[in-house]
Structure formats: C-alpha cells, structure tokens
C-alpha cells in the first residue's frame, strides 16, 4: 500500500542534514548512509549517495527520474549466481 499523501515523504533527518551541508559547501564526495527507507527528494538530484546494501556501500548517482522512489531500490541486496547446470547437457 502506498503512503498517505497528507503525511508527506519520509526522509531521515540525519540524511537531510548531510545533504544540506553538502549542498551549501558544494561538496561532491558521496554521502554515506544506511537509510534505505528514505524517499529521494528533488534536493538530492545531482548528488552521489552511498547506500548500504548489508555488506558494502553502493554509490548511487541521483537523477530526476529517481525522485519519489526509495534509496534502497537502487542498491540491490541479493546477488544471483545462477542455477546449477544440468549434468546431462554437458556431455
């Protein structure tokens, strides 16, 4: 179910403070965050945010098309190694 419009988008305050500080100082370094649940706001466009996927921080460059989505959508947590090959097909 979608979030109610009257509540507005959710963004962790510590992430918002980091983005504002980076904007004011014109800093281009990636902002490291564990907040996968935060919604991408128009203020984030053009910034690189390193989102934690459970193991490492994955750098995500935010574009206009990403506004309204969650940060966790762009940092995959699972790696698919492929199904086991059929032994009969190898012969």
From Swiss-Prot:
rRNA-binding among keywords: yes
Q: What is this protein called?
A: Small ribosomal subunit protein uS19
Any one GO MF annotation of this record: structural constituent of ribosome
User: What does the function comment of this entry state?
Assistant: Protein S19 forms a complex with S13 that binds strongly to the 16S ribosomal RNA.
Q: Does the keyword Membrane apply?
A: no
Q: Which GO terms describe its biological process?
A: ribosomal small subunit assembly; translation
Name the SUPFAM superfamilies on file: Ribosomal protein S19 (SSF54570)
Q: Which domain of life is it from?
A: Bacteria
Q: Which UniProt keywords apply?
A: Ribonucleoprotein, Ribosomal protein, RNA-binding, rRNA-binding
Return the GO cellular component terms, semicolon-separated. Answer: cytoplasm; small ribosomal subunit
State the similarity comment.
Belongs to the universal ribosomal protein uS19 family.
InterPro entries (UniProt xref): Ribosomal_uS19 (IPR002222), Ribosomal_uS19_bac-type (IPR005732), Ribosomal_uS19_CS (IPR020934), Ribosomal_uS19_SF (IPR023575)
């Amino acid at each position: 179910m979608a979030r109610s419009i009257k509540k507005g988008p959710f963004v962790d305050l510590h992430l918002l403070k980091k983005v504002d500080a980076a904007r004011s100082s014109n800093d281009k370094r990636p902002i490291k965050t564990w907040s996968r649940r935060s919604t991408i706001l128009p203020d984030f466009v053009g910034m690189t945010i390193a989102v934690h996927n459970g193991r490492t921080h994955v750098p995500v460059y935010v574009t206009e098309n990403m506004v309204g989505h969650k940060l966790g959508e762009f940092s995959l947590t699972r790696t698919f190694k492929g199904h086991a090959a059929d032994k009969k097909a190898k012969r």
